[in-house]
């Protein structure tokens, strides 16, 4: 195992049926302390990669190695321990609506540690301070904006100081100020924790300002990888179409159909 990499995905293939694969022979490496993006069009398999890393789905072939251990071969106790090392930010925050901001962040600390209440209080306030929301600790999720809720979810994802952070579409539905704030926090928190960060996103401009490396996916395969500069210089038409938002290209604008004149009987 190369100790420079916290996480390695080797020859990973997965599908709910063999006739319709979602991931096809994926190979990815995630360097310790790096911020890495998984990018690509909707339905290309990005979120499924995160689910495979967390062992929520079991691949037909291949391995996911976390610190050299295949997460899909761990027993129940081992998998539980591995998941405690993963922080997850879900696409829409997934806050507990019946708990206030403070208790949302305290939840993983109460569930997974035996820390005294006074220490949990201090840790929660520190996490909230890191995302600028210490003053909102007693508010309910219904009382805060979408951008603030995303920051609360971000604080919860780092509650246990995990070495691996995974963010599923963290920029979705955010206004420009909130988007910039979340991007800044992702980069800074990754550096502060020396955590390996995986970022699933469609947002090219904001993402390329904060990531060290990126994979571009299409139809369950990696079609491009490299630093932001290397990817922007790619001559692969599929990569170029996605990164530049071109309406037509390898991904066609028109869904296959008979000629319009024939359809209209002209």
Predicted regions and their residues:
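Conserved ABC ATPase "signature" region
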Residues: 69-70, 117-135
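Catalytic Walker B motif of ABC-type/P-loop ATPase nucleotide-binding domains
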Residues: 165-168
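The feature captures the beta-strand-to-loop junction immediately N-terminal to the Walker
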Residues: 39-41
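Conserved ABC ATPase signature
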Residues: 140-144, 148
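Helix-to-loop junction immediately C-terminal to a conserved catalytic motif
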Residues: 54
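A short, proline-enriched helix->beta-strand linker immediately N-terminal to the Walker B motif
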Residues: 159-163
């Amino acid at each position: 195992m190369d100790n420079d990499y916290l996480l390695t995905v080797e020859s990973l293939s997965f599908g709910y049926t063999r006739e319709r694969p979602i991931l096809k022979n994926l190979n990815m490496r995630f360097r310790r302390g790096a911020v890495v993006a998984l990018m690509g069009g909707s339905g290309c398999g990005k979120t499924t990669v995160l689910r495979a890393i967390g062992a929520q789905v079991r691949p037909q072939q291949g391995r996911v190695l976390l610190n050299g251990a295949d997460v899909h071969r761990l027993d129940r106790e081992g998998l539980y321990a591995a998941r405690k090392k993963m922080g997850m930010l879900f696409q829409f925050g997934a806050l507990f609506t019946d708990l206030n901001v403070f208790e949302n962040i305290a939840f993983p600390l109460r569930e997974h540690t035996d820390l005294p209440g006074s220490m949990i209080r201090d840790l929660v306030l520190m996490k909230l301070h890191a995302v600028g929301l210490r003053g909102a600790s007693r508010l309910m999720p219904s009382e805060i904006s979408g951008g603030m809720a995303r920051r609360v979810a971000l604080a919860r994802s780092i509650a246990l100081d995990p070495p691996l952070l995974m963010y599923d579409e963290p920029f979705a539905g955010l206004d420009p100020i909130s988007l910039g704030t979340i991007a800044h926090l992702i980069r800074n928190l990754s550096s502060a924790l020396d955590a390996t960060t995986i970022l699933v996103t469609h947002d090219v401009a904001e993402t390329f300002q904060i990531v060290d490396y990126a994979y571009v996916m299409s139809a369950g395969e990696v079609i491009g990888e490299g630093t932001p500069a290397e990817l922007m210089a790619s001559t692969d038409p599929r990569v170029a179409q996605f990164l530049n938002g071109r309406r037509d290209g390898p991904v066609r604008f028109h869904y296959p159909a008979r000629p319009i004149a024939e359809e209209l009987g002209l």
